[in-house]
């Protein structure tokens, strides 16, 4: 019962203090409104007005001090509240909203808090200017890419980098809109590479891609740079060496042969054969372009200036086979 009575008494006391403070504040407000202008001849002495206002301010502050102490502050260490005089700023234009003054504890005004104490907006503006200058200093180049009919007309060919589309807008005088891309790792790896894609008005299969800045992210290390345009791209394929066909070689060999027939009329036995087989490794001439072995039929003295020596001991009908 005693606890309930104590609680009821504290509530009544708190309510009474709040009412007293509210009344004092209303009186002060009324006096400030009724205060005549300094130019009025019927104004009361300035000292009396100042003393009355000071008393009302002290009553308001004291009433709210006791109210705060009653709001469950009894268990915490005693806090000494220093009353701060309230400065009343007259409103020049009653129709406009006055600027909120600084609070008692020195916290910033509401508009300062909205923009981060006046520094966040300036920092954001400085960052924007810095990034704009940084983008203008990046290298810039353009390429034209033609889309093959098999791939359709959805966009330019992939340039092996990962891009993210962040905007598109219509260009004055152009039939097709312009698309804007930036590196996927802009936020994570601070890569400022961007590109713009514009479809040609004259040929819908041609896209003009404008790059600005090179990739500084991990893609630049693991991937190759963008392909050049078809006009600038050089054919780096290895062309096979042009070789002469075996039939042409044999025809050239037959037309350039020089046959020595010295000693054909000698009385030697034309049917005496040497120990070496007459057709030893003859197949190397027809299909293989490697080392040509010598045989009793003919010896190739020089591959580019062939001279054939006929063995006089070999039958004459085999000599004629060289020419046909």
Curated annotation (Swiss-Prot):
The keyword DNA-binding applies. Signal peptide: none annotated. Keywords: DNA-binding, Jasmonic acid signaling pathway, Nucleus, Plant defense, Transcription, Transcription regulation, Ubl conjugation. Residues 152-220 bind DNA. The keyword Metal-binding does not apply. SUPFAM superfamilies: WRKY DNA-binding domain. Residues 93-126 are annotated as: Disordered. Induction: By salicylic acid (SA). Strong accumulation during leaf senescence. Down-regulated by jasmonate. Triggered by P.syringae. Its main location: nucleus. Ubiquitinated by UPL5. Ubiquitination leads to its subsequent degradation, thus controlling the timing of leaf senescence. InterPro entries: WRKY_dom (IPR003657), WRKY_dom_sf (IPR036576), WRKY_plant (IPR044810). GO terms for cellular component: chloroplast; nucleus. Interacts with ESR/ESP and UPL5. Binds to WRKY30. Transcription factor. Interacts specifically with the W box (5'-(T)TGAC[CT]-3'), a frequently occurring elicitor-responsive cis-acting element. May regulate the early events of leaf senescence. Negatively regulates the expression of ESR/ESP. Together with WRKY46 and WRKY70, promotes resistance to P.syringae, probably by enhancing salicylic acid (SA)- dependent genes. Contributes to the suppression of jasmonic acid (MeJA)-induced expression of PDF1.2. This is Probable WRKY transcription factor 53. It comes from Arabidopsis thaliana.
């Amino acid at each position: 019962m005693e606890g309930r009575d104590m609680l009821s008494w504290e509530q009544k006391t708190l309510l009474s203090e709040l009412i007293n403070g509210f009344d004092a504040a209303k009186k002060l407000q009324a006096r400030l409104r009724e205060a005549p202008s300094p130019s009025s001849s019927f104004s009361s002495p300035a000292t009396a007005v100042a003393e009355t206002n000071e008393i009302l301010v002290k009553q308001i502050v004291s009433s709210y001090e006791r109210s705060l102490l009653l709001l469950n502050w009894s268990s915490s260490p005693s806090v000494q509240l220093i009353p701060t005089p309230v400065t009343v700023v007259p409103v020049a234009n009653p129709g406009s909203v006055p600027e909120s003054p600084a609070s008692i504890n020195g916290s910033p005004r509401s508009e300062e808090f909205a923009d981060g104490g006046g520094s966040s907006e300036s920092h954001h503006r400085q960052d924007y200017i810095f990034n704009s200058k940084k983008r203008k200093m990046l290298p810039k180049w353009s390429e034209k890419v033609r889309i093959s009919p098999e791939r359709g007309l959805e966009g330019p060919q992939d340039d092996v980098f990962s891009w993210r589309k962040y905007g598109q807008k219509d260009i004055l005088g152009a039939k097709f809109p312009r698309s804007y891309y930036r590196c996927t790792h802009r936020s994570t790896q601070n890569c400022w590479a961007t590109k713009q894609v514009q479809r040609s008005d004259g040929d819908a299969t041609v896209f003009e891609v404008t790059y600005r800045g090179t990739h500084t992210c991990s893609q630049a290390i693991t991937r190759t740079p963008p392909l050049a345009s078809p006009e600038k791209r050089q054919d780096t394929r290895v062309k096979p060496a042009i070789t002469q066909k075996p039939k042409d070689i044999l025809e050239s060999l037959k037309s350039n042969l020089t046959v020595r027939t010295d000693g054909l009329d000698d009385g030697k036995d034309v049917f005496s054969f040497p120990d070496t087989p007459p057709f030893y490794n003859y197949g190397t001439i027809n299909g293989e372009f490697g080392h040509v072995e010598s045989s009793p039929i003919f010896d190739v003295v020089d591959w580019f200036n062939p001279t054939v020596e006929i063995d006089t001991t070999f039958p004459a009908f085999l000599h004629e086979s060289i020419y046909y």
